[in-house]
UniProtKB/Swiss-Prot annotation:
CTP binds at S14, D150, I151, E152, K190, T191, K192, P193, T194, Q195, K226. Catalyzes the ATP-dependent amination of UTP to CTP with either L-glutamine or ammonia as the source of nitrogen. Regulates intracellular CTP levels through interactions with the four ribonucleotide triphosphates. This is CTP synthase. The keyword Ligase applies. Mg(2+) binds at D72, E143.
């Protein structure tokens, strides 16, 4: 087996940044000429995060093949510039589903199905599947979600313990990310949480090879010696992961610490020098803007910024491409109406309405869109944001006062947005069919679909091609019954499915920049290659700000 495996665990508390650490390490190894992939193992019982509340889980990241996955896969794609797939994320729920299906099929020949070996074997097969095929990567980084000590994570930790034994030390590496808090009152770092976390890991049978210490400032050498002594690792295998203002600095910080070099030595990887010119330019451009624009994000999950993680990053990418700083103003759509919209959006150079589900906060989004349209503020609507733009235009420009989505009002005579009952899936070559009674999980129009772009439109100006592929996650779509009526009032449909049956992009050509898309372009934006629509949106905001 040519693939080397790196397992990343976390201790003390959650949200330490395992995903960013894994992505940054992967990026560094990639600059050494190695092929890298990353997989996230989530211990929760949900089959996938598709039906989870964004306030609990954050963003659901959608892959090209239609998997609804953890937001960390967004970090993986952005840092590696390699598309992820459903193979790159699995959960306890998915693992148990597979094992139970096999038991029902009789695959276990009457055996008593247990966590060990059946669940752990299934986990191992998911991990090892990354090393299959001629295009198997040189390195596979496996991030185990949650915190060491969580009862849900025990089968995953047992599985990686077994893999270490089966694959050998030269092919496996265990990295443990832990918190080293700095007590300002005492003026010192505290290592006790790290010691206890490693002790917990050792009790499971896993000896970390490298300890990555999340801290406010770099830890001194005497502290590294202490951690190495108590945690049974080499002193040069204890690294700092310091807080940064710009997350794209993390690979550079790791490189300065010698983190990737130590990993390469321990796994006997080719020790070519990392080529970091592109990362250095990215950070330099990001830290030295030539102006500033303010963009309002109008949503109902704004109290948890992680719910819009890819969106946030895509706007930053657009700023880097335009050499401007993008200040984001999160506005709760439940607090917006026509009477106070001017107050909420005073000083904004762009207004973005993202996706979402359910009626709560929708009228506030519509009020924000009306303000953007009437006041010539650059507007970008994504998924539900596009649908709300259609509703607003129908109500106020096409004399359809009760215009709405079928999702929100079944009694409306002008359902300009309605439930998709069937569509063609070009990947499976099947016609997918749904109705109001279908299961919620995994039943939307998901993944990458082609879009035909109309020449001489804002969209074509951005893409510079007439055919693109974008990622979708929705049940509702524009109702073509109203296409002619809205077109007569000035709306154009600049992007459609190849057969012309589904409206994917809408624009108002008389507006400085007003565009809505049914897909999620933020999932395909990259720090060194901003998505064309985000690049153009921020460019329009820059023009509005007169920067």
């Amino acid at each position: 087996m040519k693939t080397k495996f790196i397992f990343v665990t976390g201790g003390v508390l959650s949200s330490l940044g395992k995903g960013l650490a894994a992505a940054s390490l992967g990026a560094l190894l990639q600059t050494r000429g190695l092929s890298v992939t990353i997989q996230k193992l989530d211990p929760y019982i949900n089959v996938d995060p598709g039906t989870m509340n964004p306030f609990q889980h954050g963003e659901v990241f959608v892959t090209d093949d239609g998997a609804e996955t953890d937001l960390d896969l967004g970090h993986y794609e952005r840092y590696l510039n390699v598309p992820m797939s459903r193979k790159n994320n699995t959960t306890s729920g998915a693992i148990y589903n597979q094992v139970i299906a096999k038991e029902r099929h009789g695959d276990y020949l009457g055996a008593t199905v247990q966590v060990i070996p059946h669940i752990t074997d299934e986990i191992k097969s998911v991990v090892l599947s990354l090393a299959e095929g001629e295009d198997a990567p040189d390195v596979a980084i496996i991030e185990i979600g949650g915190t060491v000590g969580d009862i849900e994570g025990l089968p995953f930790l047992e599985a990686i313990r077994q893999l270490r034994s089966e694959l050998g030390r030269d092919n496996c590496l265990n990295i443990h990310l832990t918190l080293v808090p700095y007590l300002r009152s005492a003026g010192e770092h505290k290592t006790k949480p790290t010691q206890h976390s490693v002790k917990e890991l050792l009790s499971i049978g896993i000896q970390p090879d490298i300890i990555l210490c999340r801290c406010e400032q770099s830890i001194p050498e005497e502290l590294r010696r202490k951690i190495a002594l108590f945690c049974n690792v080499d002193q040069d295998a204890v690294f700092s992961s310091v807080d940064v203002n710009n997350i794209y600095e993390v690979p550079l910080k790791f490189y300065a610490e010698g983190f990737d070099q130590k990993v390469a030595i321990m796994l006997r990887l080719p020790a070519r020098n990392a080529q970091l010119d592109a990362w250095e330019k990215l950070v330099s451009d990001s830290d030295n803007p030539h102006g500033k624009v303010t963009v309002a994000i109008v949503g109902k999950y704004v109290d948890l910024k992680e719910a819009y993680k890819s969106l946030h990053e895509a706007l930053i990418h657009g700023g880097v491409a335009n050499r401007v700083q993008v200040d984001l103003r999160y506005v709760n759509s439940e607090n917006v109406d026509d009477s106070n919209a001017a107050e909420h959006f005073k000083g904004c150079d762009g207004i973005l309405v993202p996706g979402g589900f359910g009626y709560r906060g929708v009228e506030g989004k519509i009020a924000a869109i009306r303000y953007a349209r009437e006041n010539k503020v650059p507007f970008f609507g994504i998924c539900l944001g596009m649908q709300c733009a259609v509703i607003e235009f129908a109500r106020h420009m096409a004399d359809m006062a009760d215009a709405n989505s079928e999702e929100f009002d079944h009694r409306s005579k002008h359902k300009v947005i309605y439930l998709m009952t069937e569509w063609y899936d070009f990947r499976t070559r099947n016609v997918e069919k749904r109705d109001a009674g279908s299961d919620k999980g995994g039943t939307m129009r998901l993944g990458s679909y082609p879009c035909k772009v109309m020449p001489e439109s804002r969209a074509f100006e951005a893409y510079k091609t007439d055919m693109v592929e974008e990622r979708h996650r929705h049940r509702y779509e524009f109702n073509n019954e109203f296409k002619e009526a809205l077109a007569e009032k000035g709306m154009i449909f600049s992007g459609t499915s190849p057969d012309g049956s589904l409206m994917e992009i809408i624009e108002l050509p008389e507006h400085p920049w007003f565009l809505g898309c049914q897909f999620h372009p933020e999932f395909k934006s990259r720090p060194m290659n901003a998505h064309p629509l985000f690049r153009e949106f921020i460019g329009a905001a820059k023009k509005h700000a007169k920067v």
